[in-house]
Amino acid sequence: MRIPEKFTINSQEITVELVNTLPSQNFGEYCCITDKIKLATNVKDDGTVIPLKEEQIENTFWHELLHAFQWHSKGVFSEEESNTYAGYLIEFFKSSGLIIK
């Protein structure tokens, strides 16, 4: 899957940036102030840099996208919703044969 560099939600441009690592072993983050999603390509664990698999980065993208949806629809975030719905989306795309380019 090609992760977009930017897209629009609720007339707001959301940008996406791939970064080497994020603090606190985070795989990704959405900032509602800058409307930016950052996705890590690696995670540090006890000083060791571990590369993330493509599937992990894609799952993180969907998770953070759902945080953007949450923020723009109700002004709050829910980790439980984002985790659950990101998993549902990935399972749907894989099982349906729907291809996202």
Language-model regions: role of each:
Residues 73-101:
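Post-HExxH zinc-binding segment in Zn-dependent metallohydrolases
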Residues 2-10, 17-40, 46-48:
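Catalytic zinc-binding patch centered on the HExxH motif and its immediate surroundings
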